[in-house]
Regions:
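Bateman (tandem CBS) regulatory domains
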Residues: 1-11, 17-20, 72-82, 148
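The conserved cystathionine-beta-synthase
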Residues: 11-39, 45-46, 64, 84-104, ...
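Short beta->alpha transition motifs characteristic of CBS
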Residues: 37-39, 43, 50-65, 102-104, ...
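Conserved N-terminal catalytic core of the sugar/cofactor nucleotidyltransferase
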Residues: 65, 132, 161-235, 246, ...
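N-terminal nucleotide-binding beta1-loop-alpha1 segment
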Residues: 121-150
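Active-site metal-binding loops of divalent metal-dependent hydrolases
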Residues: 140, 236-238
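Catalytic-core segments of class I nucleotidyltransferases/pyrophosphorylases
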Residues: 232, 239, 245-252, 265-268, ...
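A short, conserved acidic/glycine-rich loop-to-beta-strand motif
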Residues: 254-264
Length: 350
């Protein structure tokens, strides 16, 4: 079913805005509106409200992967060839939107002057696919030293709050989650006691690893009936405010078998770096440059095909599983995180 979005004007953004402006506006437009909360988009218009293009969360993230700065023009993150409907043609517009649900979940409505006058939104988009979550919480946390001697790493507190509670909060906010699996090993009883004290919208099942199976091996312990469902795998030692709905939608619309969430990491080389040609001729000396790289953020969406690549209780880490999928010609994409993200790897991170 499709509905007209009465407050569509909050989705309009002018063509002099930046990508950063678009990110903020997209995060703001869903507040207090049940329809748009889970389907955020922007309509790029000129000063007379003529449609220039459309922008989704995925468009913004793809622009980041292309190397665009957040201060770049929003046009760099815009679909400049949008599909649109026409004024007073509700039946045709509804049919058009239904025919393109494999691409998008909304349809700008224009008048004869190509000005935006409305927006049609589907509340039955194919993107709304349910998903199960596997929370990886069985590690020893050795890098934290004595802090994890009697406490599992996910229960270590940062700013007065257990690390795992941050992850559980974003999982609980995701309206697509139907079941949560939690992989445990080290001090599992303490972990279960803490998690069981919380309230969730979905059932929880604990998977106990008799011996550590690596960062991906517990996928082999999941119920066989999940062979038709995607699995979201997330580490229990992250601090992030990512909206998991956006990640899952990105995975589905990209038609990936695996989507790896990545975060930008910057490190400084403490020396002058020499640039030179293939013949050995000097080109440039750069003093202590900053290097930016995308790193795996400990969050993945995997299709059932990845579970089929595992044998029961196989010991394997996630990089090896992802590379195995690559060798089997599975489609693997990346999802850049621009939201808050950090990994608790040392006492200094607390």
């Amino acid at each position: 079913m499709s509905v007209l979005y009465k407050n569509f004007t909050q989705c309009l953004i002018k063509n002099n805005a930046s990508i950063k402006d678009a990110m903020k506006k997209m995060n703001d437009i869903g507040k207090g509106d049940k329809i748009i909360k889970n389907y955020q988009f922007l309509l790029l218009v000129d000063k007379t409200n003529k449609l220039i293009g459309t922008i989704t969360d995925g468009d913004i993230r793809r622009s980041i992967l292309r190397g665009e700065s957040l201060n770049s023009s929003v046009i760099k993150a815009t679909n400049m060839n949008p599909i649109y409907g026409l004024e007073k043609e509700y039946e045709n517009n509804n049919a058009l939107l239904n025919s393109i649900l494999h691409e998008t979940f909304f349809l700008p409505i224009l008048n004869k002057n190509m000005q935006v006058i409305d927006a049609l939104v589907s509340d039955s988009s194919y993107l709304n696919k349910n998903i199960s979550v596997l929370l990886m919480a069985g590690g020893f946390g050795k890098r934290l030293g004595n802090l994890t001697k009697n406490t599992p790493k996910p229960l270590i507190k940062k700013n007065g709050k257990a690390i795992i509670d941050n992850v559980l909060d974003i999982i609980n906010k995701c309206n697509l989650v139907t079941k949560l699996y939690i992989s445990t090993h080290y001090l599992s009883s303490l972990l279960k006691e803490h998690v069981n004290s919380r309230i969730f919208k979905f059932p929880i099942k604990y998977l106990y690893e008799d011996t550590p199976l690596g960062t991906a091996g517990s996928l082999s312990l999941l119920d066989n009936k999940l062979k038709e469902n995607n699995i979201l795998v997330i580490n229990a030692d992250l601090i992030t405010n990512i909206d998991l709905n956006n990640l899952i939608d990105y995975h589905n619309i990209s038609k990936n078998d695996a989507t790896i969430a990545v975060a930008e990491y910057t490190y400084k080389i403490p020396y002058g770096v020499i640039e030179y040609s293939s013949s050995g001729s000097f080109l440039e000396l750069i003093e202590k440059p900053d290097i930016n790289k995308f790193v795996a953020a400990g969050i993945y969406v995997l299709s059932p095909k990845f579970k089929s690549l595992l044998s029961l209780e196989e010991v394997i880490d996630m990089p090896d599983l992802i590379n195995r999928g690559r060798k089997n010609n599975l489609a693997i994409g990346v999802f850049p995180i621009y939201e808050e993200w950090s990994d608790i790897g040392s006492p200094e991170d607390l």
